Amino acid sequence: MSTLVTQRSWIQRNRMTLTPLLFLTPGVLFFVVYVISPIIQSFNISLYDWDGMGQATYVGLANYEELLDDRAFEISIWNNLKWLALYLLAIPLGLMIALFLNQNVVGIRIYKSLFFFPFVLSQVVVGLVFSWFYLPREGLLNAVLTFFGFDTINVLGDPSMATYGIIAAGLWPQTAYCMILYLTGLNAVDPEQIEAGRLDGAKGVRMLWHIILPQLRPATFIAFVVTIIGALRSFDLISIMTNGGPFGQTRVLSFYMFEKALSEYGFRMGYGSAIAVVLFLIMLVFIAYFLWSMYRDEREARR
């Protein structure tokens, strides 16, 4: 009985500490099992030559050395850089649309619904819609070009244009996502600061730059994080629209990893894991920067 009383008193005394730990434990366990463990396994498998079924052969850093001379790997990295640079256009585009939708004009709810619509579509639907849009003969794009007297173009069949066509498809829903972030942020903008700015003569670009954008910094931060990670993880649109073609010119690291490790081109688990490790390290640089920025902002806010 005394032991039970002592135990209860210990739990009572530490309840404020134990309660958050109790709620955090399931999430931490899932994170360790489904995130940390696969990352460690990828590092380990990248040191082996393994087809996923038979005996694995230790090869050390041979897979990474092979990457240095792999032309397809070079193309994949270059395409990832294109995605990273052009995908960021979703942020200013989303901001401009949000600023427009934040006005009190006739039919604004209809406009909001139209711009919100791409966000609720899955990437599969977006890929199919833009595949039809780019069709060489029946597609809407070439119908418009023909109407205005221009020659038709095969966007997804041209190695020099295909990647840009896929990125344009990805920008459609990503811009809608950034728009939603900024609309939420605009609702939290302090109207007193805007009024004070107007009294000081600020309007237009000056109002946006000096008063509105500083208050939208949290939304901008989230938009950058999600957009950059989305650009580096691009896979589904490529798989649906070109399957890496034409001639492998639309591959990115995530798709090339899939081809080497799991598709009919390879079953080279070790080589695919090496590609995954490189992609993870690239993403880790951005994630570390974002975490440091969050820590720095929180530290400054406490002062």
Describe the predicted segments one by one.
Residues 1-13:
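Short, Lys/Arg-rich, polar N-terminal cytosolic tail immediately upstream
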Residues 16-303:
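A structural signal for multi-pass alpha-helical bundles of membrane permease subunits
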